[in-house]
Amino acid sequence: MASDTKTPVVLCWHMHQPSYQDMRTDQFLFPWVYLHTIKDYSDMAAHLEANPDARAVVNFAPVLLEQIETYLIQIEKWRHGAGEIGDPLLAALVAEQLPETGTPAFLGLIEKSLRANRERIINRYPAYAQLAELAEVYRKKPELQRYISSRFLSDLLVWYHLGWMGETIRRSSHCIQSLQEKGHNFSMDDRKALLDVIFDVLSGIGPRYRHLAQKGQVELSVSPYTHAMLPLLIDLGAAREAMPDIALPAHSHYPEGEARAAWQLQQARTVFQRFFGVDPSGC
């Protein structure tokens, strides 16, 4: 029997990526921060912008925000000849010289350029699917790489980033549409233009979500700085609330757990305020 009682529903979107940076070299080991930003985090903002009556709580992990900041700083320094881009995949997109064919570095970039959903991303674009098919051959028979040029890899890198591009960006960006129509033989100017789009999307994430919050459409919240499980820092026994039979250390709490938990929250607020220019409404 249907009930007349209305149940409030809160849609909470949790935007989280762990730290992918090698602390020794500051190099990014995986590209998921900037790829999910140009795809999912951007599209989510666009859907909310297009539907003024929609409401949502959006939570950002501080380590994600810090990595977006790092990408922006590195790209800006690279533009001015004052530094390198610390993500091998993004750096290769605009590299003047790509690795020599047949080398492990060349094959490594091929591998990275295939890390995408086959049906929803790769096969959606005939040009990308064709490049991916050739790439599979070169992966299985590396000795054949000597017969191809760096043009193959530069086109594959461009299509990898085009494939990951958010749908709303694809529909609105003349640059993205032009590159898709061109399809192959991408020039250095094409690759730099694509990097410009990526930079613009990354730099726009903070202002867009801040504006949505100011309009009252979004409540912005933040997680502990490193996404730490604060109850466990304070009381290891809290784990038994979800897993009664779990084996736990003899200690009742993590060393300096309360102080560490307080630092996690304070550092989270600091990063959030720096990125969005406002304090979080929830934590």
Task: Show the residue positions of the predicted features.
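Catalytic cores of glycan-processing enzymes that make or break glycosidic bonds
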Residues: 2-282
